[in-house]
Amino acid sequence: MSKKSQLVFAMVAGELSGDILGAGLMAALQKTHPNARFVGIGGPRMEALGFESLFAMEELAVMGIVEVLSRLPRLLHVRSSLIKSITELKPDCFIGIDAPDFNIGLELKLKAQGIKTVHYVSPSVWAWRPKRIFKIAKATNMVLSLLPFEKAFYDKHQVPCTFVGHTLADDIPLESDKASARQLLELDPDAEYLAILPGSRGGELKQLAEPFVKAALLIKQQFPDIRFVTPLVNQKRREQFEQALKAHAPDLEIHMVEGKSREVMAAADGILLASGTATLEAMLIKRPMVVAYRVSPLTYQIAKTMMQVNRFSLPNLLAGRDVVPELIQHDCTPEKIAAAVGVELNRDFAPIKAEFERLHQMLRCDASQKAAEAVLALVDAKDVN
């Protein structure tokens, strides 16, 4: 364990899920180094623990290849400013949390300046653009992976990697309490609810709010007594979703909640959601789900040429087989979504729940503590390439 009186960590988290991971890692590091300083880009959870943000996290919350291109000048400015600030700071370690297209380039520059670098959350190199592993090898001293199959990929390419498990698997109980979640959200204890999660980013809602709202109308025809509840990450996303609801289903009642996505999923009987980290959360909460996603046509065509896998959602990737339905791009239509939700709500969920329980146990490793131990071991290491 490092003997320095004050360790300094530079960190960059690119979105909500990164803020959660960053806060967990900070809390674990603060157990042994209560005076540690944390600087870079973080969200509200990290800032609540004393993180010093040089830029707002929203600057990095961009989805899709085409969408990134439109913001490229600003992103490059942010990165060059960070390189200057962090190089002057000379931290004991830089930790890039997810956001690989931004962070790996940053890590490459910082490592060249003699700063130890960690990338927390492996990019999906096993799924698409596998040659990125060579850049990752040059950019980082260590990768912290959340998923067990990722470490095998890094070991094969002789890139230092530690499997730490997933903080969500640590945080979410093995059996979630539907009744308590409904009480907290003031939902009817006896009604059937479908949770609708169209994503946390503006670009996601732009693509998904309309098909999700239209699908809800069709689902209401199949299940007249069903109710809908939607968590929105902030007021801006709520307004965006309300606009879609007003335009496409003005008479449909959807109960909206700011934040509390985990509680909303726990309160629900089924979940319709965007592909991403939320699918892992839904799996750990153990509810029937339908995963859907859509990006701009150009982004999709570019991504399709680089894909190495034919599954997208984390439950299916972890299981190594199709356990939840995925409706991607051209299949992300109101009709197909509604049909898939109908099937999931009517089927025997017991075998799928058993698989979710197995995967939950596999990922439950006290991730933040393991990540902190790996980072501190790197800080203490003398001979690091």
From Swiss-Prot:
Pathway: Bacterial outer membrane biogenesis; LPS lipid A biosynthesis. It catalyses: a lipid X + a UDP-2-N,3-O-bis[(3R)-3-hydroxyacyl]-alpha-D-glucosamine = a lipid A disaccharide + UDP + H(+). SUPFAM superfamilies: UDP-Glycosyltransferase/glycogen phosphorylase. It comes from the Bacteria. One of its GO terms (cellular component) is membrane. Belongs to the LpxB family. This is Lipid-A-disaccharide synthase. It comes from Shewanella sp. (strain MR-4). The lineage of its organism: Bacteria, Pseudomonadati, Pseudomonadota, Gammaproteobacteria, Alteromonadales. The gene is lpxB.
